[in-house]
């Protein structure tokens, strides 16, 4: 039985991530999520992250499977600025837009929405339920027929309820990343 500690090998895989917020997803987690979703991702897709933060999930998506156009929206201006810088470090072209997803309009539809859903802080259960309802309504406006949503959420009950209530959605895969 041989055991080696490989702490002296430098790993620059996530060196693009120069900017981070307290709510930012760790790049290894983003890489895991897109890796799990890889069978559903298509090359030259038009992609959007409605709650992009600093862009980690989109950068990892573009790293795994090439995309045609990538759009990112967020209401937090600093996140947009940081995301632009991270994307530049990653040599990934992403169109960052400082706008609320629910107010976003675009000339064409997207093949994929990929996102880390906002976490419930002080919102009530009713407010979060309404948020997920609005998200799925707006997502339907932005997705092409046969488009997909890759979503990381800790509110699986709200997600499943919206899928159950809508004929245009179906759950293709569910993976528990962290079970507390």
Residues of each region from the PLM?
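Class I S-adenosyl-L-methionine-dependent methyltransferase catalytic core
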Residues: 1-180
């Amino acid at each position: 039985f041989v055991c080696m500690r490989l702490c002296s090998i430098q790993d620059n895989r996530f060196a693009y991530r120069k900017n981070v917020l307290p709510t930012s997803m760790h790049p290894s987690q983003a890489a895991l999520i897109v890796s799990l979703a890889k069978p559903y991702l298509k090359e030259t897709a038009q992609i959007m992250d409605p709650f992009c933060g600093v862009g980690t999930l989109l950068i990892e998506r573009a790293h795994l499977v090439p995309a045609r156009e990538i759009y990112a929206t967020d209401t937090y201006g600093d996140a947009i600025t940081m995301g632009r810088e991270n994307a530049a470090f990653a040599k990934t072209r992403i169109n960052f837009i400082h706008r609320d997803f629910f107010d976003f309009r675009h000339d064409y539809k997207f093949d994929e929405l990929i996102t880390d859903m906002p976490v419930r802080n002080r919102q009530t259960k009713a407010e979060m339920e309404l948020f997920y309802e609005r998200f799925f309504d707006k997502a339907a406006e932005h997705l092409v027929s046969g488009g997909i949503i890759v979503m990381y959420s800790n509110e699986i009950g709200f997600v499943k309820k919206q899928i159950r209530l809508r004929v245009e959605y179906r759950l293709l895969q569910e993976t528990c990343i962290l079970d507390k």
